[in-house]
Amino acid sequence: MTTDCAFLENELYDVARLFPERPEILTHSFRFENGKFYNSFNVDGEEYSYADTAPFSGELQFKRKEKLFAKLRLYSILSDKYGIKMPWGALTGIRPTKLAYREKEEGRNFSDLFSFMGVSEENIALTAQVLNAQEGIYEKNEENADYFVSLPFCPSKCEYCSFITAPIDKTRGFLPPYIACLQKEIEASAPLIKNLRSVYIGGGTPFAVPAEDLGKILVSVDKIRKNDCEYTVEAGRPDVFTDEKLRLLKDHGVNRICINPQSFSDETLRKIGRKHTAADVYRAFDLSAKYGFSVNLDLIAGLADETLSDFSYSLSESVRLAPDNITVHCLCLKSGAKLKEETSYLDAPVVSDMVALSREFLPGNGYRPYYMYRQKYQAGNNENVGWSRKGKECVYNIDVMEEIADNIAVGANAVSKKVTFSDGKITRHAAPKDLKTYIGKIDSIIAERNEFFGR
């Protein structure tokens, strides 16, 4: 694919890769003339030309319109060529709700733009439901911040996983210096915090870390968490749950945990490299129940050879356990995932049926969608949706997905974000991915992040 407009190259590629077939020839040219956005395409020898008009003010709005029309016109060509309509139409960004909020803030109905871009009525309704669920939580305030602690250790690596995580058995030698550096970084970050909205300890599987080391991190977080804000630990796989670790969380004010079975099929769990069974999930819930945590449970649609019936059973079992949150992810195979190396395609129709089932089943059992996001290489061009009982929505997930608060992130592979509302800019500061480099550079990492936040 070639284009004479460099900043559109990736955008147009993202549209093209929505489709299971790709044109052998795809060229694009753009010009703006006499108030019109002209886009011309050559797709496998067929010529297409479009002229669109729209009001804009300033360079930023011009770029947005330029991108919108180019993506829409290419999507229309390929949709007609292959006879396929995508559920999100020409939208390829990972945050549909963020675009919807922007339309609302500029005095427009977001559904008009979404319809124009070919988004299905079902997804327009889903977006509206998410925005409605976020009322009273969504807040733009320059002083707001969320806090992320990275514990990038797991019992083993799942077949579908692309995260930079380390099997705990192979990295125990790094654990003592890593914990010490993480404590130092957490405590040095105290001056960065003004209004703390939430704390999230993730990874990885934080419960893969020994209780003694987990306790050290919780003590350090106590020093920077000066209010009773939401406090989540993504405990993770149910086979690493212990009463000792759960009691530690309760003693340090943690009020929300994540249990991540992904499926209630023992056969599926075996295929994806999990070392636990569905029975371990029930045990983890039983252990957690006496501590009164708000619980999120993760499922993945599209796992190895799962049928709609398998996924339906996982949904039913999840609802039977009655967590406050259920998050339904669609399988997404990125570089670094073993399954991506072994699989050339995902069964998009089956995954789409699973998504449709979750949208029908969960609202009927007291859950509503409160946040969502999309990813590249996602089965069926679908989305990940967090479902919640009313009043139990996760602040951290909303803030991070809508990018409406600074994110102070500590630990290896942690990415801090600074949000500036005046110009809409979001800047990032990434820590080293590997443990050895992180440990060796901890002092410079602390100094750079403090400078990044201007403290």
Which residue stretches match the model-derived regions?
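Radical SAM enzyme core and accessory elements
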Residues: M1-E106, S388-R455
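A C-terminal junction/extension of Radical SAM enzymes
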Residues: I25, C332, G336, K340-V410
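Short beta-strand motif preference
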Residues: N39-F41, V149, I257-I259
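N-terminal [4Fe-4S]-dependent radical SAM core
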Residues: K81-W88, E105-F148, I193
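Canonical Radical SAM [4Fe-4S] cluster-binding loop centered on the CxxxCxxC motif
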Residues: E142-P177
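Beta-sheet entry/capping signal
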Residues: N144-D146, S198, E230, N325, ...
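Beta-strand scaffold of nucleotide-dependent catalytic cores
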Residues: S150, C258, N325-H329, I398, ...
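Conserved non-cysteine loop/helix-boundary elements of the Radical SAM core domain that shape
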Residues: T165-L357
